[in-house]
């Protein structure tokens, strides 16, 4: 029985889809004005994990993750670069997809772009105006009337009175209330725009997600996800817009993943502690980065450091050493490990406990490796099966363990030396065999001999 922590209720709830076995999930995606940073990677991996487990559990999932391809940041960056906004976003979308491929992220079923849904935004804004939840002051903008929506603040637990007292809000004489937020922005010189009933302009950020989600999944759906930094105001405003427009509950459950922290501080450009996914993947194996992101509970903050990456690498090496030398066969045996893994994942996608189960499974594989190799091979298949839920352990063991050799040692040279050493051993030329081993050790290569075969990896 799957339970999910619902940010809306602030409790774990038994997950009950709205429509039988069908699950509809919407996740706020990237604003594509720059290369994706590791915080984006956290969200990608977190909801990829949710996707994998829901499907593994037999649910028929429709996963939608949007792309914000028009925004102040996009316009500013395009102007800085001297290119059109759509040329910038096309380039960044391609880069994002490449980052996802390297991190083994499954493609969403739908990936709507804001600029493809302008007509739908016009329609929802007009509905809000007709119902009295929005107003056009005549300057080309349209604003949402926050004070009219009775449930405002129910996600973030913020009260309108406190927001008015505590918020630092720039005075905008066009607004009826300082808390009102923009649904449609009137055109400014040099900016891209679309025609609308209120004059040329472009959509506000919040209305984009309300329209794309309901267009793709319907007026009510099962799960809405995103980073914890989006809970307020973005997700709060989505609820206000969508429920005012439709009169129905917007999303049944809200899931928010934690932030990436560096030395205790949130990763951000302003603190100059910002790492793009591609920068990190230039240094670390993609599976190491993915394991770092998936091994912590999705709601927890992750501290990014050299030590944490080394720990992730060490964990994967233990897994792959257990798989090494065993044939790829169908998963067999280890039902108790499957049960424990399922219990962990059904408890709000509890990956720390699930990873602990994998370590126990590794110990059992190693225990049986010599005494019952067939049983060990079946359990190795089970390890890969469970690892696939986390998006790891699908590589050949030798390929992972040798990763990083390029630029450090010549793999062809290593293989030639190993063959020369095997010949020396066959000739019982032990001195030459030892000399070659010493040469390889000096190169940072560790040899492992077993049953007439020799494999190698780089030393830690």
Curated annotation (Swiss-Prot):
Its main location: cytoplasm. SMART domains: DALR_2 (SM00840). Pfam families: CysS_C (PF23493), DALR_2 (PF09190), tRNA-synt_1e (PF01406). It comes from Pseudomonas putida (strain W619). HAMAP family: Cys_tRNA_synth (MF_00041). Belongs to the class-I aminoacyl-tRNA synthetase family. It is found in: Cytoplasm. This is Cysteine--tRNA ligase. One of its GO terms (cellular component) is cytosol. The keyword Translocase does not apply.
